[in-house]
Amino acid sequence: MATAAVERCKRKLPDRLAIVRADRSQRQFARDLGVFQQNVNRYESGTTPHTDFLITLALKEQISIDWLLLGKGRMRRSR
């Protein structure tokens, strides 16, 4: 994947995180995931999330990694 395409995907990740969080506060979202609220804040502000966070998010929230990272397909994984 070209560098420009990677950067575009990275720029859109904070927006997708906010979509997953929905109407929950960052504090509640962090609690639901078992992570620190400061990390959620940093990731929604544009810091690249750690792999562990992304995996936890995908598993606990039933989120498609393709959608989360690339914006492709449906947000929710099939059960």
Task: Name the predicted role of every residue range.
Residues D52-W67:
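DNA major-groove recognition helix of helix-turn-helix/homeodomain DNA-binding modules
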Residues W67-R79:
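Short amphipathic recognition helices of helix-turn-helix/homeodomain-type DNA-binding modules
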Residues A22-R42:
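Short alpha-helical DNA-recognition segment
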Residues E44, E61, K72:
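DNA major-groove recognition helix of helix-turn-helix
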Residues D23, G46, R74:
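Alpha-helical DNA-recognition elements
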Residues M1-R24, D32:
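A short, Lys/Arg-rich alpha-helix, primarily the initiator
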